[in-house]
UniProtKB/Swiss-Prot annotation:
UniProt keyword ATP-binding present: no
Name this protein carries in UniProt: F-box/LRR-repeat protein At3g58900
Record domain F-box: where: 1-47
Family matches, as PANTHER family: RNI-LIKE SUPERFAMILY PROTEIN
Name of a matching Pfam family: LRR_At5g56370
Sequence ranges of the LRR repeats: 116-144, 161-192, 199-230, 235-261, 277-308
InterPro entries on file: F-box-like_dom_sf, F-box_AtFBL13-like, F-box_dom, FBL60-like, LRR_dom_sf, LRR_FXL15/At3g58940/PEG3-like
Keyword Transmembrane helix found: no
Record-linked SUPFAM superfamilies: F-box domain (SSF81383), RNI-like (SSF52047)
Source species: Arabidopsis thaliana
C-alpha cells in the first residue's frame, strides 16, 4: 500500500486543494478510491486558458469549448449538494453565458464564501442577480479585460469583507448603494472602474483598505467632487485623474497612502502656464487649486508616497523640494 492510500480522506482533500481542478481530476485514474475523491474538494478553480492550451491554438478546434463546458458541468454534478468554499472561474468569449450563469448560481446555492470571476466576453455581460444578494460571500473578485456589468437596483451582501472590481461600470448612484449594501466591507479595490457619477463620496466607518487605480482607464465623466469619510482606513492607494474638488477628506487613522494624480499633457502644460502672474489656478483648469485639499486631508498619515505629477499639481510654483524633519 502506498503512503497516500493510507491517509484519511480529509487529509487527501486538503492535499488536492493545492492543485487546480483540472490537475485534481487527473488523480481519478490512480485507483477506484481516487476516482471521485477530487469531487469532494471544496475549492474549485476553472481556467479555460489552462484547459484549452492557447499556445497550441486549441481554442479554435471544433468542439473544444464544449468539452470545457462539459468538464465544469461534470465536476459540479459530482459535487452534488456538498459545500463549496472557493470558486474561481476564468473564461473568455466562446463559452456560453448561460452556462456561466448556471455555474455561478450553483455554487452560490451551496454557500460559497470566496468567489473569483474573470469573464472576458466581447459583448457586455451582466452577472446573475444572485451575486448581488448572497448572504454567504465574504470575498468577491469580479474582473474582465473589457467591461463587465453586474449592478442591480437591490444589493445586499451582509457578510462581504473584501470586494475587488476590475473593469466594471459604476452607474449613477450605484457606488453609494454598494457601500450601504456591504456593512461589513473592510477592503475595497477598484481597478479600471468607470465612474458615471460626477459627485462621489466614499463613506464607511469600518473600511480599512481602499485602492482606486484608474490608470489607463477613460472614465465616462470627470469627477466634479470626490469625498472620503473613512475614519478607520489604514491603507489608501489613489491613482486617478484629478477631481475638481475634494470637499471632505476624513482619514484620521491612515497609516500608509500612495497618491498619483494623473494629468494629461495638456493639463501639465496648463499647470506650468500658471507661472504667468496674470492667471490663477481655476482660470486654467477648474479645481486645480483644490488638489491641496486632498493632501492636507492626509496630515495624520505615517507613510506618504507622492508621484511627481501630484507634487506639481499640489505645489503650483514648486521648483525645488527639500524635506527637513525627524524620521
Amino acid at each position: 500500500m502506498d503512503l497516500f492510500s493510507s491517509l484519511p480522506n480529509e487529509l487527501l482533500y486538503h492535499i488536492l486543494s493545492f492543485l487546480s481542478t483540472k490537475e485534481a481530476a487527473l488523480t481519478s485514474v490512480l485507483s477506484k478510491r481516487w476516482r471521485n475523491l477530487f469531487a469532494f474538494v471544496p475549492y474549485l478553480e476553472f481556467d479555460d486558458s489552462v484547459f484549452l492550451h492557447p499556445e497550441e491554438r486549441k481554442r479554435e478546434k471544433e468542439g473544444i469549448l464544449q468539452s470545457f463546458m462539459d468538464f465544469v458541468d461534470r465536476v459540479l454534478d459530482l459535487h452534488g449538494d456538498s459545500l463549496i468554499k472557493t470558486f474561481s472561474l476564468k473564461c473568455k468569449t466562446g463559452v456560453d453565458s448561460d452556462h456561466v450563469d448556471r455555474w455561478i448560481c450553483n455554487v452560490l446555492a451551496r454557500g460559497v464564501s470566496d468567489l473569483d470571476l474573470f469573464i472576458d466576453f466581447r459583448d457586455l455581460y451582466s452577472l446573475p442577480h444572485e451575486v448581488g444578494v448572497s448572504r454567504t460571500l465574504v470575498v468577491l473578485r469580479v474582473g474582465s479585460e473589457s467591461d463587465l456589468y453586474w449592478w442591480q437596483k437591490f444589493l445586499c451582501l451582509p457578510m462581504l469583507k473584501t470586494l475587488v472590481l476590475d473593469s466594471c461600470w459604476l452607474c449613477i448612484g450605484q457606488f453609494q448603494i454598494l457601500l450601504l449594501a456591504c456593512p461589513a466591507l473592510e477592503e475595497l479595490d477598484m481597478t479600471n472602474t468607470r465612474w458615471k457619477d460626477s459627485n462621489v463620496t466614499v463613506s464607511s466607518s469600518i473600511l480599512k483598505e481602499l485602492t482606486i487605480d484608474l490608470h489607463g482607464c477613460c472614465s465616462v465623466v470627470n469627477l466634479k467632487s470626490l469625498s472620503f469619510d473613512a475614519p478607520s482606513l489604514v491603507y489608501f492607494y489613489y491613482c486617478d485623474s484629478l477631481a475638481e474638488d475634494y470637499p471632505q477628506v476624513n482619514l484620521k487613522n491612515l497609516v500608509e497612502a500612495q497618491i498619483n494624480l494623473l494629468l494629461t499633457q495638456a493639463q501639465i502644460e496648463q499647470v506650468r502656464a500658471l507661472n504667468n502672474e496674470m492667471l490663477v489656478a481655476d482660470d486654467v483648469f477648474p479645481g486645480l487649486g483644490n488638489a491641496w485639499k486632498l493632501i492636507t486631508g492626509l496630515r495624520n498619515v505615517q507613510q506618504l508616497y507622492l508621484s511627481p505629477d501630484t507634487l506639481e499639481v499640489s505645489f503650483l510654483s514648486l521648483v525645488y523640494f527639500w524635506l527637513v524633519g525627524r524620521i
